[in-house]
């Protein structure tokens, strides 16, 4: 979470959004750095757990956060503007083994649609950078299934941003035994 926040280049007092906040790991790290954190998740039970996590931490450190149940596909309905968005979005169900190929292809198509819609919404509300994780699936036929990230970015009005020549984007973030590989992208508006 700390790496993601740092890649978002947020400064103390700025506001970040995690539209897939889950149990609020990214929000906690942001708030510890003095960044105002807003989290949205479509699972009310998960929002309840996130609230418990943030309240526990808040009693010791901070209270600069806000949680709300909601749909990441409708962000502009909930949020006017944020400085940055930092998130690990929904990556599909948990897999105990490599993904069946046909399922991976269907999931890829679903996630491409979801991410395009969400990034279009993010485009309406974000002032600066977006840190977004895209998955790649290892399949049962030893073929990897990747999302068409170029199309997603083109359709949503974003491009890849690289803060330094020494940092190559995307940043691979996974264990060799992972069934879902994660790639961290830093995005900016076109």
Give the residues covered by each predicted segment:
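Class I S-adenosyl-L-methionine-dependent methyltransferase catalytic core
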Residues: 1-190
């Amino acid at each position: 979470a700390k790496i993601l926040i740092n890649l978002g280049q947020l400064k103390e007092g700025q506001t970040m959004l995690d539209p897939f906040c889950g149990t609020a790991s990214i929000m906690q790290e942001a708030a510890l750095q003095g960044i105002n954190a807003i989290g949205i998740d479509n699972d009310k039970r998960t929002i309840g757990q996130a609230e418990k996590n943030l309240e526990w931490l808040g009693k010791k450190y901070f209270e600069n956060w806000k949680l709300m149940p909601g749909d990441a596909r409708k962000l502009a309905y909930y949020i006017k503007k944020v400085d940055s968005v930092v998130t690990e979005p929904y990556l599909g169900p948990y897999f105990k083994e490599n993904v069946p190929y046909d399922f991976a292809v269907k999931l890829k198509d679903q996630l491409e649609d979801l991410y395009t819609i969400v990034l279009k919404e993010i485009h309406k509300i974000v002032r600066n950078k977006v840190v977004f994780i895209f998955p790649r699936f290892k399949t049962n036929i030893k073929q990897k299934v990747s999302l068409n990230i170029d199309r997603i970015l083109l359709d949503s009005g974003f491009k890849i941003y690289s803060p330094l020549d020494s940092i190559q984007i995307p940043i691979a973030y996974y264990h060799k035994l992972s069934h879902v590989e994660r790639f961290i992208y830093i995005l900016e508006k076109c």
